[in-house]
């Protein structure tokens, strides 16, 4: 991590009380960053985070400032903006079933809220903004994915405007299932096992990309360091079937049985991290892909070159065709998370 880039700088994290915000704090607290601003609408989570900092890291608590607001409210985000150098935009409605039942709430937060953040950033002269997206934005079939796909296009449009003004660099990251983030399935499986109940599986043949929270932060940092305006960054990720993921959790925590409950509203059999169309513009950067922005304007005639043909990529990059982990590989993967490690320690302490 290029900590020197953040020396004496101010970083604003929208949705900062979530799993991503907690992990960013863990990465940055001991560095020479000037200030971290946590922007969110939940005062209880902010209070919990503040007490956690004062209890565990009192020497760094002064670096962190809390702002109560909502990305839906343009003025509240503007109030948090003075003096900000960089932004990690993580505020979102992300639960697929909730967005299916309340799609306009997803529109308000994921689309309009993102536009509010980016307009405020451009007007305030913020240097760099990294926005967090999800694989559900690629070939979307549900309200969560559709709103996030629109969010991405809002990002690209604002990135184009900011670049034309010679100002803020705006880019996007897209990642798959972040293990043990809030609302994800591994904590649910663990809670069900510890309660002595069977774990509930939607479809054992579903596949999902797997990455831990540290990898999510690493992806954002890679994008921060390498982005041109409007770029999309994707981490190369392993995948697992939901059935193997359940077996991996049972191998670590115990087998209390399994109930297959069927797919929920808006769920896919597999997820796509990069579409065929995006692969045409992608650059392999080792552990990551960069998808360059399409910076053409609407005057297409000037982009036509006689004899030039672009061939479509063979396939999308999906959780079905990426490297598939078996049960043992999935066990090793989920053991990279602090959540699973801590849950295992708690179980051992209860037995002692």
Regions found by a protein language model. Give the residues of each.
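Strand-loop microenvironment adjacent to phosphate/nucleotide-handling motifs in alpha/beta enzyme folds
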Residues: 3-5, 157-352
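N-terminal Rossmann NAD(P)H-binding glycine-rich loop of SDR-like oxidoreductase domains
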Residues: 9-31
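Rossmann-fold scaffold of SDR-type NAD(P)-dependent oxidoreductases
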Residues: 14, 81-90, 131
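Conserved glycine-rich Rossmann-like NAD(P)H-binding loop of the short-chain dehydrogenase/reductase
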Residues: 32-48
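Conserved residues in the N-terminal Rossmann fold of short-chain dehydrogenase/reductase
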Residues: 40, 67-68, 108, 203, ...
């Amino acid at each position: 991590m290029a900590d020197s880039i953040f020396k004496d700088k101010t970083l604003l994290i929208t949705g900062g009380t979530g799993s991503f915000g907690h992990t960013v704090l863990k990465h940055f607290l001991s560095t020479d960053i000037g200030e971290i601003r946590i922007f969110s609408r939940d005062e209880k989570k902010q209070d919990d985070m503040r007490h956690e900092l004062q209890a565990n890291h009192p020497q760094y608590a002064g670096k962190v400032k809390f702002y109560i607001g909502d990305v839906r409210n343009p003025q509240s985000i503007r109030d948090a903006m003075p003096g900000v150098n960089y932004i990690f935009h993580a505020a979102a409605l992300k639960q697929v079933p909730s967005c299916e039942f309340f799609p306009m709430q997803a529109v308000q937060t994921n689309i309009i809220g993102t536009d509010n953040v980016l307009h405020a950033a451009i007007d305030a002269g913020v240097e760099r903004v990294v926005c967090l997206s999800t694989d559900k934005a690629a070939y979307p079939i549900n309200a969560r994915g559709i709103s996030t796909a629109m969010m991405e296009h809002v990002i690209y449009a604002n990135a184009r405007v900011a670049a034309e003004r010679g100002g803020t660099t705006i880019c996007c990251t897209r990642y798959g299932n972040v293990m043990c983030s809030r609302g994800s399935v591994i904590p649910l499986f663990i809670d069900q096992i510890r309660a002595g109940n069977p774990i509930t599986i939607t479809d054992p043949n579903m596949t999902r990309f797997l990455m831990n929270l540290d990898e999510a932060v690493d992806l954002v940092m890679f994008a921060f360091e390498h982005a041109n305006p409007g770029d999309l960054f994707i981490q190369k990720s392993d995948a697992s079937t939901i059935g193997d993921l359940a077996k991996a959790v049972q191998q670590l925590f115990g087998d209390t049985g399994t109930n297959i409950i069927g797919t929920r509203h808006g769920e896919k059999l597999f997820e796509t991290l990069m579409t065929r169309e995006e692969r045409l513009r992608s650059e392999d950067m080792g552990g990551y892909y960069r998808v360059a922005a399409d910076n053409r304007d609407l005057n297409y005639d000037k982009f036509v070159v006689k004899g030039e043909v672009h061939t479509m990529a063979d396939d999308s990059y999906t959780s079905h065709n990426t490297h598939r982990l078996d049960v043992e590989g999935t066990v090793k993967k989920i053991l990279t998370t602090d959540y699973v490690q801590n849950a295992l320690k708690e179980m051992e302490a209860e037995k002692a």
